[in-house]
Amino acid sequence: MDKLQRDGKEDTPRQRRFLYPLLFQEDLYAIAYDHYFNRSSSFEPMENSSSNDRFSFLTVKRLISRIRQQNGSIVPFVNCDQTKLVGHNRSFYSELVLGGLTAVPEVPLSIRSEHSLERMNEWTSFRSIHSILPLMEDKIPHSNFILDIRIPHLTHPEILVRTFRRWIQDAPSLHSLRSVLHEHRNLIISSNLDQLILIASKENTRLSLFLWNYYAYECESLLVPLWKRFFYSRSLPYESFIERTPFYRKIEHIVIFYHKYLKKSLWFLKDPSIHYVKHRERSIIALRGTYLLAKKWRYHITKFWQCHFHLWPQPYRIYIDELSNNCFSFLGYLLSVKMKTSVVRIKMPDDSFITDLITKEFDPIAPTTLLIGSLAKEKFCDISGHPISRLAWTGLTDDDILDRFDRIWRNIFHYHSGSSKKDGLYRMKYILRLPCAKTLACKHKSAIRVVRERFGSELFTKSSPKERESIFLSFSKTRSQRERIWHSDIIQINPLINSCRKKHNLQIEPLFDR
């Protein structure tokens, strides 16, 4: 694989056209076996694995030599009954073939990604999810509308094959990929990424995620150059915009300009403010302009999907939201822009006066109601927030019970430390303290009062002294209650917060039809 990448850097077109021979290399299936074994071992112990799932490289060599003699393709791996052919489990060898087909397209795509990163010297990778929020904090207040985009799900495997044609000219590899995609249609047909991973866990998660990421990358890689061209283009096309026409007419009636001088003067009117962020299957485009401009962008993006990917997305896939009147959910936060009024004293040489300065401020809030719903789903409380004891944890030691509740609380606080209002986090801590006390009371068959007298302030103090100091300072009354803290070590969303995010998406999806 490394040698192929080194050769590909010297002659990338030749490397793209001859990927199919990789499918006949035993080392490729050894790599696929490693991925399969690592994934399987995390779900079940070795003693529970079937004897038919034991991998044999000798069997792979026999199958490869048999295909070479028949001068066929990789289709017998997928469509034939492997149990009758070699006496092994068909699904197991199908997993290995899918893993091999995943590794082959990754070679040219990884080389292309390395070249693109080498050309972008200013590129810096931020792995933390919170790295998106400071960008939104800086740019969103200057925008008027957002386009909440959900990437349309694929409806046919041939769409992916056509996108691969742009980068891979090896026809046998494309035919093999087409056969696998038609055989395993549920690897790519799903309404969202969470459903895709849930379905693919029974088949091949690595191939599913690779196909989804490649498809999302294609959607972005074709849109971003259009935005860059729009940003660096001259302002002359703005004259054809409908919302600008009355403005031009007013200028023509007030001052008489020659047509060529009018166009030169309108160069200062150009104000393209387009900001784009993406997480999983959701994308946010922030625009500064009128509602008509936002509708035009939605129309162009929809037409773009139809022309390049032959997709007809539903209307709720692109939702226009006005920031001044509404909030939107993203990354487990409720985000909005609010007006902030400040009293300013203006001093002049002869006099001074006081006036109000109105500014826009980014306002992220932790969705307390949805978080309580997620806690209710996990049986920590009821739907109204009334605490419930965890009877399933009564068999654990006291330290384990305290540590589990403390870890849940620290994860919630750590992720939502950027919330502008900490009252909801206080409530979450109160809700979690009572189930912890009730669980300990049920274990020791005593009252909650006795548990509190026994443990005292040790509830939720299992974290390290440094973490306790950070939490104490964050909740200190001397600090601003609206101070936001973004962490650079959050690389994935907490499962409880992820459940909250999915629940909120289900609640707001019917509103997208308007």
Curated annotation (Swiss-Prot):
Stored InterPro entries: Domain_X, Maturase_MatK, Maturase_MatK_N
Keyword tRNA processing on entry: yes
Domain of life: Eukaryota
Subcellular location: Plastid, Chloroplast
GO cellular component: chloroplast
Keywords assigned: Chloroplast, mRNA processing, Plastid, RNA-binding, tRNA processing
Protein family (similarity comment): Belongs to the intron maturase 2 family. MatK subfamily.
Role description: Usually encoded in the trnK tRNA gene intron. Probably assists in splicing its own and other chloroplast group II introns.
Annotated protein name in UniProt: Maturase K
Organism from which the protein derives: Dioon spinulosum (Gum palm)
